[in-house]
């Protein structure tokens, strides 16, 4: 493994802790501060909206100032957003807490660019493996983030969880330590990135469209159910916070641990077959969720939810990098992430409403619609 890829992995571990901490805490804190129950998942949803709105900007900014500075600015920004969020908990401001989560989402949008940066420091044939390895770093984030957040939650007396976000600020800024030693590979000038095909020309390619569908709806299913899980488990089913946190950790680990083999599986069997497997894994989640809502069933459902996301998202991302030329990469990556995370934002925004108005089981059945869309795209678009 080359030095640059190793540094990106280490930096990603700390930069991405914002994501599992947000998943772990936002619904619980949202339920505490929100004026009505249906707004409990609004902070989580706004963090995803932040990801969506900053996705294209992140790619655009990096095309001008480079990956290294882009990642450093994002770490500083996430640190500031975490401090703002801690302050919002101290003064018990739901509005300010939502703003903090939105800005943290903006930082997460930049951290999603690590997977593309990884591709740029390896040979193109190694791209699926590089993407898998960089996503594998998410396991470290999944265990470091929530554990540190849980340990530090009472650091500020009378303001539970404010300490968690102070800890997140430290974790976020720590990623810059590794970026200092990162040597950005030489690329074409920023002016040349203005050339190449338009977005509509790019998306007219069947492979590009397939990559987009797989990634977008994988995120839709995963986010729709994951956002609702802490509230459904802890607040509705009265399962302990520690058990709820452990299920979320296992889910995030399941999202990234298969990355050890996913790249090799794609290389051996092709993108389509691995995407089909992802759909089947999602189906296991839905079937499991139709039974009793207990600790074990939540655990099994969320593990398979993570596995399905991994197969679909890595397949989609590794297929995407085959669909554009060097001068088009930031445009293609930016628009892809804009669409993927906009759909994720819609799923996250609607999760709290659907959970409040329907049920956990109904939400899982709704996800069948997304699975049908992915399956249809696979059958109609042959890769």
Labelled PLM ranges:
Residues 25-37, 227-243, 247:
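Short amphipathic helix-loop junctions that connect adjacent transmembrane helices
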Residues 54-67, 258-271, 355:
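Helix-to-loop junctions at the C-terminal end of transmembrane segments
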Residues 26, 108-123, 311-324:
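Intracellular juxtamembrane helix-capping segments at the cytosolic ends
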Residues 1-2, 182-213:
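Juxtamembrane intracellular "pre-TM" segments in multi-pass secondary transporters
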Residues 100-136:
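Cytoplasmic helix-loop-helix junction between adjacent transmembrane helices
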Residues 129-147, 339-347:
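Glycine-rich segments within core transmembrane alpha-helices of 12-TM secondary carriers
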Residues 76-91, 281-293:
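C-terminal ends and interior cores of transmembrane alpha-helices
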Residues 169-189, 377-379:
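C-terminal membrane-cytosol helix-exit motif in multi-pass small-molecule transporters
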């Amino acid at each position: 493994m080359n030095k640059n890829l190793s540094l990106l992995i280490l930096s990603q571990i700390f930069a991405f802790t914002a994501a599992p901490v947000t998943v772990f805490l936002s619904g619980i804190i949202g339920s505490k501060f929100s004026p009505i129950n249906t707004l409990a998942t609004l902070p989580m949803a706004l963090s995803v909206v932040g990801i969506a709105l900053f996705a294209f900007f992140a790619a655009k900014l990096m095309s001008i100032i480079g990956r290294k500075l882009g990642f450093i600015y994002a770490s500083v920004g996430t640190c500031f957003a975490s401090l703002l969020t801690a302050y919002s908990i101290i003064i018990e401001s739901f509005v300010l807490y939502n703003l903090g989560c939105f800005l943290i989402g903006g930082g997460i949008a930049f951290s999603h660019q690590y997977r593309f940066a990884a591709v740029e420091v390896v040979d193109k044939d190694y791209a699926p493996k590089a993407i898998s390895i960089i996503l594998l770093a998410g396991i470290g984030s999944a265990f470091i983030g929530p554990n540190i957040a849980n340990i530090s939650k009472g650091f500020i007396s009378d303001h539970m969880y404010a300490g968690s976000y102070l800890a997140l600020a430290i974790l976020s800024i720590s990623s810059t330590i590794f970026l200092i030693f990162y040597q950005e590979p030489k690329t074409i000038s920023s002016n040349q990135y203005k050339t190449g095909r338009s977005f509509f020309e790019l998306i007219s390619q069947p492979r590009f469209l397939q990559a987009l569908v797989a990634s977008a709806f994988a995120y839709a299913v995963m986010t729709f159910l994951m956002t609702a899980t802490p509230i459904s488990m802890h607040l509705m089913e009265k399962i302990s916070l520690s058990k709820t946190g452990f299920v979320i950790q296992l889910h995030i680990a399941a999202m990234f641990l298969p990355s050890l083999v996913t790249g090799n599986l794609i290389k051996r069997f092709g993108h389509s077959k691995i995407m089909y497997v992802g759909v089947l894994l999602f189906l296991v989640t839905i079937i499991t969720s139709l039974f009793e809502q207990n600790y074990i069933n939540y655990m099994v459902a969320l593990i398979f939810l993570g596995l399905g996301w991994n197969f679909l998202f890595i397949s989609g991302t590794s297929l995407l990098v085959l669909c554009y030329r060097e001068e088009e990469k930031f445009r293609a990556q930016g628009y892809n992430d804009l669409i993927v995370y906009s759909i994720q934002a819609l799923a996250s925004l609607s999760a709290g409403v659907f959970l409040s108005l329907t049920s956990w089981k109904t939400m899982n059945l709704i996800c069948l619609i997304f699975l049908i869309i992915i399956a249809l795209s696979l059958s109609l678009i042959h890769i």
